Amino acid sequence: MEKTEIKNGSEIYDTVRELLCLFGADSVQTVEFTDSSHGDLDIRHNYLIDRKYVLRINSAPVMTDGRLEELNRLIERYREFGMHAPKFLKAKDGRFIVERDGNICYLSEYLDETVADDVKDGCLEELRTQRRIFIARFAEKYRNVDLTETVSMYSIFDLSPYDKLDGLEIDEKHDNFNHLTADLQKAGEYALAERLVQENESIRRELRSFYKELPRCVFQGDENFSNLCVDENRRISGLFDFNMSGTEVIANYLANAALNFFYTDEIMQSRSADEIYRMLTKAYAESTELIRKYYNFTPQEFRAYRLYSKIAMYSAYWNTSAFSEYLAQEQCAEKVVRLLWKIAEEDFRA
């Protein structure tokens, strides 16, 4: 995201300095602003102060004192695990939240380290491997530790805070899936859409019968390379941005972490649907083999992992968006349809 420098003497600069004083920090030299808002009803303003603090001003009431307290406990676990992670700081009155003009304001430390996204060229696959190992090891160590009522964005069935904020009555993957089947129907692929609906309902019905019995863990929830830091050897060394954090069924979280196939123009234009399906399942099998070296699934968990994996294959956002994008391209549409038929019909095994 693009940063904008806030000039000393401006109204915003004075507001930032005033708010910072409430947290016991009086000195302000430089302020950089980034806007990660999701429309006018979901304002997310971020102010980087002296490369030491981040002041966030949000309109959505997702963050509360209780939520930030539980996030600090999670951050402490990541630190114990060997990762650098910035904690949230309390104001002088002992609370994390300061209210201003109908918005909530809160402060955290700033992790002034190299972001993986800036150095991933040349080591992308190595970083992806490190990320899967890191997540699997964390899940193994902190299985069922200090679980929270807040669920992660990966959640199936239970709604995350941002699902609720968006007005959804279904989980995000179900919403993604509905968009995909709607696009298939618009393209005249009614039989395929119906077959996918049948498969999705069957898998979800099976999962619903036992998912509440499965081990869980609280995760950071958004380990993309813009939220991960690396050391001088390009080893993952820290993480930040805990907005999406929450409790998740470990089998589901790992099924999403295992996604390691990306639909590109080169692949979609030069490969057949059968070849793409083989590439997809091979990549997933390799990820699964790696994850199993660091996380010990129970038989019931691995049964769930296989079911969650298939849901991720056709309902994870980056997959559904790719399917819809290439479905709209005449030269790729038939290939997407055949690929989705294979995903629906094949007895996929992660």
PLM regions with names:
Residues 16, 20, 172-221:
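An alpha-helical support segment within catalytic cores of ATP-dependent transferases
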Residues 39-51, 55, 202-252:
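Active-site acidic catalytic loop and adjacent metal/ATP-binding pocket
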